[in-house]
Amino acid sequence: MLIGEHLVPELGHENQVGVQCEDAVPTSTNLLILSHEPKYDGLVQLRYSFRLYPTAGQRISLARAFGCARTVFNDALRIRRDAHQAGQPWPKTGELSKQLITEAKRTPERAWLGEVSSVVLQQALRDLDTAYRNFFDSLSGKRKGPIIQEPRFKSRKDHRQTVRFTANARWSLTEGGKLRLPKIGDVPVRWSRVLPSTPSTVTVVKDAAGRYFASFVVETEPGEVMPRATAEVGIDLGLTHFAILSDGTKIRSPRFLRRAGKKLKREQRRLSRKAKGSNNRTKARIKVARAHARVCDARREFHHQLSTKLIRDNQAIAVEDLCAKGLARTRLAKSVYDAGWSAFVNMLEYKAARYGRTFVKIGRFEPTSQVCSQCGVKDGPKPLHVREWECKACGAVLDRDINAAVNVARAAGLAVSACRARVRPGPVPAQCEEAGTHSKASRTSGSQAGIALL
């Protein structure tokens, strides 16, 4: 979810959907914007993440905070599950807070909960409330997408650990640029820009590769509308070429996972040979996680650079609503996941909303590959190995991908043309009723005379 500042410095590093904080590729900064949510008062909520470099003692304190928050979360989940199975009333958050935090600190078994900020423990209960709310909303249909699973117990072996500090925790930023966290200390931060406003919360994240991030939530005014552009573009997403534009431009797929496959296999083999539970296995697991993180970072960098360039150059953008999950059940699964279409489309969507561009997503059942972009005649489905085809109605020779991109734009109502597209109009054959001698003299059209349609 990074975008190189060497390409588009004024737009910054933005991403809407990812929740996993990743480090940058070597040539980039460490800033990410993970989400933006418009509010009713006109403010926009942004999330900025920066890399943290805690000391050895601070890593121990953070591990203690992760463990305490995990314990409170699991205890609350267990109480609610037991109450549900026994047919008892639903335990409220206030009751759980009193029982699992306030009273538990006074017992010898849970006295160590007092070693961390109480705000961290309170936020663990709120996280459980959010998980249950999302679960019930997915069952009732209020939440879009597939039904999500019921909240599960957290494990100390989970690859991703988080704790959140709100304003009540009285965390702050020091004059030296460090992040001061209660009962943890001043943690060094690698800053890449100044925050646009005072953050309301900060979440400390430890990922599978052992890296630490500070994720700040700020509220600010919507981004400035970019200068109006004249171009409009339709995009057809693919595998050999990641994106094909309606103007004929083809952008090859970098295939980051395929390129890193040899190193990933080597690290996976080394991991499989380590004894379970040993320190060497832990080290090998971290190496595998770091290799995967580099692939994710490179892919995210590519998505950000391309999406920002498209937003800057075009006033309106149209894409097809692809079913990535359906394609992932085919032999193309690895390539589909390597492309990361959904993340790229989400970047286009939120950047268009933020910078005053028009974004249109057409239905996935639109026959973009079956309709001739020159005459509009539907020619029927074609196998994937057919990359060029000739329209039987007008004789135009069409590039499959560019033709689909033009149809995507037209289905979205955009006025685009296939500039530089491989379209070779041919003579239209005369119909049966036109093949004989006309009994009456009349003006002959270009199509009737076999003249190429332009």
Pin down the residues of each PLM region.
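Nucleic-acid substrate recognition interfaces
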Residues: L2-L454
